[in-house]
């Protein structure tokens, strides 16, 4: 019996050993898997790839804790940034004239200009040395020295190496800030298996961009944006960002100490000016007349003029101011886009406007430029208003600008900046429906109300003048076409 048992034991022993070894291997594999599962990876992310830097003269741009698609250029150890980036992300008041290679910046009182590749810039009539080239023209834009941008903008920036990156702050909001409790890592994504972007140490300061259950999205002071374990951070605190080195500009306006009751007076010939006494006598309460006297007449910036000094004298004798209207649509052969996108012709136009204001002793200038598109000359039109405003204010002349009600197609108007410079913004509260549109009201109450409320979001109430129509349209609908009859207000009753 024992001999038989011994024989069986000998046969079973190898099997038991093999089974034991298999179990041991499985246990080891399980332990290894558990260790691998819960052991953070030490793999690091290539920061050059992370910041998408492709050459040694590039630097990443991190703006308000967001990585920009734009890159800075390092030229002779100086930082340059693309004009489009400056305009869209830092300060929209910079204006690049690609036709004449000049960079302009308009303050409340001065026009500051710098020519491409020049070390100097002029402030009105004074020339200043910047020390190195301020702006360099490129094939489709321009590169501007970031130090020069900072000189006129509410921004701060710091540069870092390995890899080269610039961290810019341009929004001065409240942020969630915290400090690191213990040394840890910032990773590409939330999870210990995600590659490491940066090692952080105890007491390092970070900004919390988004809080999670276990991982928070954060930004380090040197511009690395990633994820960190929530428990590795102190309790977050609200912190209001400030820029003590920047002093906000003060804009002054020539505003009247009374409500404005303005009438646009359509004048189509020199002889029509003699009718102003009848026009005024048939109205009540008007304190500003704006005759349609001037329009852009050629591509050099010159004006056509049907104004009258007698008209102005009569209005003044009645206690009425005269704000001459200047338009861009009377002469269809003129390319207004060309005039406004070239600094030299834009300057000629402004000088012509001021010359007319002096010659006819105008109290104000009313700009009625229409059919403006962003692609053609949107930015150039805003720059035109800025530059004209400085000339007007230096000579005690009011500037008003006629604008359509806010809509998706005219967001580029930047009414808030326009209101910084112009004294009054005149809402064209009419032509809700027009020739070529569906039939409808010229100026319905809901449409006008929405236009005023939208404008108030950008323009102070005491700078708004609401232009209302004293005309209507009687629409005729036929199977093949839509037409209308244009009627003045006093003619409407007989057609109802």
Q: What are these language model-derived features?
A:
Residues 257-267, 295-444:
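Chitinase-like catalytic core of GlcNAc-active glycosidases
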Residues 3-212, 242-255:
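Primary recognition of N-terminal secretory signal peptides and signal-anchoring hydrophobic helices
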Residues 275-276, 411-415, 452:
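Short beta-alpha junctions and helix-cap segments that line functional grooves
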Residues 230-232, 236-277:
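Boundary/entry segment of secreted carbohydrate-active catalytic domains
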Residues 426, 450-476:
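Active-site region of glycoside hydrolase catalytic domains
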Residues 198-205, 210, 262-311:
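Conserved, compact domain cores that house catalytic/ligand-binding motifs in diverse enzymes
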Residues 485-492:
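Conserved small/polar residues in nucleotide/adenosyl-binding loops
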Residues 201-231:
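SH3/SH3-like beta-barrel superfamily modules
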């Amino acid at each position: 019996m024992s001999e038989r048992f011994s024989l069986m034991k000998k046969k079973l022993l190898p099997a038991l050993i093999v089974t034991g070894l298999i179990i041991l291997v499985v246990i080891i594999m399980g332990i290894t898997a558990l260790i691998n599962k819960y052991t953070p990876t030490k793999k690091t992310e290539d920061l050059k790839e992370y910041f998408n830097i492709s050459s040694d003269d590039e630097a990443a741009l991190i703006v308000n804790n967001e990585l920009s698609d734009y890159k800075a250029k390092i030229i002779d150890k100086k930082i340059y940034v693309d004009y489009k980036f400056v305009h869209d992300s830092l300060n929209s008041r910079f204006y690049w004239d690609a036709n004449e290679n000049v960079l302009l910046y308009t303050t409340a009182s001065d026009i500051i200009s710098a020519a491409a590749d020049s070390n100097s810039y002029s402030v009105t009539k004074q020339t200043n040395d910047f020390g190195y080239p301020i702006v360099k023209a490129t094939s489709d834009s321009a590169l501007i020295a970031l130090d020069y941008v900072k000189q006129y903008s509410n921004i701060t920036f710091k540069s870092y190496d390995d890899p080269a990156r610039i961290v810019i702050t341009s929004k001065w909001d409240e942020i969630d800030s915290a400090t690191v409790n213990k040394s840890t890592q910032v990773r590409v994504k939330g999870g210990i298996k995600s590659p490491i972007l940066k090692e952080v140490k105890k007491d390092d300061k970070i900004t919390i961009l988004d809080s999670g259950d276990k991982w928070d999205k954060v930004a380090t002071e040197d511009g690395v944006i990633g994820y960190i374990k929530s428990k590795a951070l102190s309790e977050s605190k609200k912190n209001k960002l400030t820029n003590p080195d920047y002093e906000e500009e003060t804009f002054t306006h020539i505003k009247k100490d009374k409500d404005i009751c303005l009438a646009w007076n359509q004048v189509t010939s020199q002889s029509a000016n003699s009718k102003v006494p009848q026009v005024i006598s048939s109205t009540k309460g008007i304190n500003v007349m704006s005759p349609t006297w001037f329009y852009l007449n050629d591509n050099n910036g010159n004006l056509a003029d049907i104004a009258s000094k007698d008209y102005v004298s009569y209005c003044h004798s009645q206690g009425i101011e005269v704000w001459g209207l200047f338009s861009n649509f009377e002469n269809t052969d003129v390319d207004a886009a060309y005039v406004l996108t070239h600094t030299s012709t834009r300057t000629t136009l402004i000088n012509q406007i001021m010359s007319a204001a002096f010659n006819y002793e105008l109290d104000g200038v009313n700009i009625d430029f229409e059919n403006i598109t962003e692609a053609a000359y949107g930015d150039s039109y805003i720059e035109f208003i800025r530059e004209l405003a400085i000339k007007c204010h230096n000579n005690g002349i009011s500037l008003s600008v006629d604008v359509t009600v806010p809509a998706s197609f005219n967001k580029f108007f930047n009414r808030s900046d326009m209101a910084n410079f112009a004294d009054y913004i005149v809402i064209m509260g009419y032509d809700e429906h027009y020739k070529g549109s569906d039939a409808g009201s010229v100026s319905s109450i809901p449409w006008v109300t929405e236009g005023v409320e939208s404008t108030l979001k950008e323009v102070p109430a005491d700078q708004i003048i609401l232009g209302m129509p004293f005309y209507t349209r009687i629409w005729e609908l036929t199977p093949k076409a839509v037409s209308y009859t244009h009627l003045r207000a006093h003619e409407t009753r007989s057609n109802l």
